[in-house]
Amino acid sequence: MVSLEKNDRVMLARQLPLKSVALILAGGRGTRLKDLTNKRAKPAVHFGGKFRIIDFALSNCLNSGIRRIGVITQYQSHTLVQHIQRGWSLFSEEMNEFVDLLPAQQRMKGENWYRGTADAVTQNLDIIRRYKAEYVVILAGDHIYKQDYSRMLIDHVEKGARCTVACMPVPIKEATAFGVMAVDESDKIIDFVEKPANPPAMPGDASKSLASMGIYVFDADYLYELLAADDKDDASSHDFGKDIIPKITREGMAYAHPFPLSCVQSDPQAEPYWRDVGTLEAYWKANLDLASVTPELDMYDQNWPIRTHMESLPPAKFVQDRSGSHGMTLNSLVSGGCIISGSVVVQSVLFPRVRINSFCNIDSAVLLPEVWVGRSCRLRRCVIDRACIIPEGMVIGENAEEDARRFYRSEEGIVLVTREMLRKLQVKQER
């Protein structure tokens, strides 16, 4: 382990990102989000009133000084590719800056699609090698968080690691969805189990497990060796969490990086923010958290901005209808191009170009772009997918049995409405 002086750290914070390439794994379907990902990959799902989920990983790279980025795509990639082409074309080719889109190459052993997360990188190795990076930062494209990857790179170098895994404590009942690790006093990973049925608890805290965040830093040459060996292993599932990280752990070459060391937050006393919005309830809740008085995730931090594709839209408008009812909102996010006419919106998130007509009550709802809500509707605890037209007088979120019959209702009572569901409902009513 190398002990670095403050001046050395400042220098490395500038140099290491320039020697690195980031690979964002963005091919996941996100089946737990149900119909919300039927026509888009999970990283392309809308979030926070104006963003896409992948904007967080991309913005973290940009803010950390990593300007060479590969985005590995697969499932329903058109929306994702279009978003990146329109919103992330700010890099300078003359300065060797880029965002490369890397689809499934469909050339390894006759496979059409990626066999696992590690295979997604393996299939693109010939392209990745051309980047001539010393370090490879591998990221999930479907998490909400702010992280300075340069700090993680410094930790990687300081510990003399060949592989570094970002980690944070999670409630033990949720740890079955993550890779869970045990570490020694030097943060060396001494045990790693992917999605265990009975997650081991952290020493001194039986209520939590130490979970992998799916964020890795590798020495580039070491990663290439690992992937070449894994590709030849017919018994492997070709996955970082299931195969690569356990192998490195057995070899004693993997170290943990505690997320608080690199988490970017305005309030240093706050809990580090990282969300895997993989379920409908988690997605709904993370969106509504941003509309609270003091959100856990600060989206107004000018020192760490989250970028996205910006459309030229007029400001949101709140108008009085002909009967004299005022358009009002409280504790909500309302994006450009929205019009609220004679209705009340409370604790909700409205994406661009949402139109709410008179006499509506919108409470704890997430309305994606171009949603049109007819007069006298009541929407509560729901997510309305893009371009849905909610008929006049429709009530959602008040009758569990009716919601489950017409739409998708989660066990927690969150209702998802899509255009296809509304179309089927209309056909049924016309019979």
UniProtKB/Swiss-Prot annotation:
The record marks Q74, W113 as: Could play a key role in the communication between the regulatory and the substrate sites. It catalyses: alpha-D-glucose 1-phosphate + ATP + H(+) = ADP-alpha-D-glucose + diphosphate. Beta-D-fructose 1,6-bisphosphate binds at K39, R419, E420, M421, L422, R423, Q429, E430, R431. The keyword Nucleotidyltransferase applies. It holds the Pfam family Hexapep_GlmU. One of its GO terms (biological process) is glycogen biosynthetic process. Pathway: Glycan biosynthesis; glycogen biosynthesis. AMP binds at R40, H46, R52, R130, E370, R386. The keyword NADP does not apply. Keywords: Allosteric enzyme, ATP-binding, Carbohydrate metabolism, Glycogen biosynthesis, Glycogen metabolism, Nucleotide-binding, Nucleotidyltransferase, Transferase. Its EC number is 2.7.7.27. InterPro entries: ADP-Glc_PPase, ADP_Glu_pyroP_CS, GlgC_bac, GlmU/GlgC-like_hexapep, NTP_transferase_dom, Nucleotide-diphossugar_trans, Trimer_LpxA-like_sf. Alpha-D-glucose 1-phosphate binds at Y114, G179, E194, K195, S212. It comes from the Bacteria. SUPFAM superfamilies: Nucleotide-diphospho-sugar transferases, Trimeric LpxA-like enzymes. Allosterically activated by fructose-1,6-bisphosphate (F16BP) and inhibited by AMP. Gene3D superfamilies: Hexapeptide repeat proteins, Spore Coat Polysaccharide Biosynthesis Protein SpsA, Chain A. One of its GO terms (molecular function) is ATP binding. Involved in the biosynthesis of ADP-glucose, a building block required for the elongation reactions to produce glycogen. Catalyzes the reaction between ATP and alpha-D-glucose 1-phosphate (G1P) to produce pyrophosphate and ADP-Glc. Belongs to the bacterial/plant glucose-1-phosphate adenylyltransferase family. HAMAP family: GlgC. Homotetramer. This is Glucose-1-phosphate adenylyltransferase. It comes from Salmonella typhimurium (strain LT2 / SGSC1412 / ATCC 700720). The lineage of its organism: Bacteria, Pseudomonadati, Pseudomonadota, Gammaproteobacteria, Enterobacterales.
